[in-house]
């Protein structure tokens, strides 16, 4: 899931130390809906982004980012996502908080999610947002999506789905 608004206040230089190929390959479930829940581990790679400077000039409240990512399990593309984030707060130290909504298109259906994402001025940025619904295999989906921004284009995500 993208969230890089204006290079995200230095996130482009932050790496987890985990090789991207290893992060994407760390999967533990299929795309089926067996049992009461599953975790889908993916690598989200940015494919397009538009930053909209809607407030005062510069990075501030009201600015938006519209994005799409390709979703990978290992080296195989398994879907895509798209969404928009609106900046709510920019602190004097450069940290910020945005309201984000995104839809993940996967084999068998879509998963919708939203939540607040806090980006520190420096250091690792992580997020945890609510699954708000779905279609197809995911029509009764609930749960959350957690993730870590690895660099300016890649995020490691885990979709925790309950039915």
Q: Positions of the model-derived regions?
A:
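Secretory targeting and sorting signals
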Residues: 1-25
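Beta-strand-enriched cores of mature, soluble protein domains
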Residues: 24-163
């Amino acid at each position: 899931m993208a969230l890089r608004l204006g290079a995200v206040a230095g996130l482009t230089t932050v790496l987890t130390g985990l090789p991207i190929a290893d992060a994407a390959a760390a999967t533990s479930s299929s795309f089926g809906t067996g049992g009461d829940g599953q975790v889908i581990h993916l690598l989200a790679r940015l494919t397009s982004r538009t930053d909209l400077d809607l407030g005062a000039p510069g990075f501030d409240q009201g600015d938006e980012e519209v994005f799409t990512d390709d979703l990978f399990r290992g080296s195989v593309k398994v879907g895509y996502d798209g969404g928009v984030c609106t900046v709510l707060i920019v602190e004097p130290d450069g940290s910020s908080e945005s309201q984000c909504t995104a839809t993940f298109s996967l084999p068998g259906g879509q998963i919708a999610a939203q939540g607040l994402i806090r980006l520190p001025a420096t250091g690792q940025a992580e997020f945890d947002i609510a699954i708000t619904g779905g279609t197809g295999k995911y029509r009764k989906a609930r749960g959350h999506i957690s993730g870590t921004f690895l660099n300016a284009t890649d995020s490691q995500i885990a979709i925790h789905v309950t039915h």
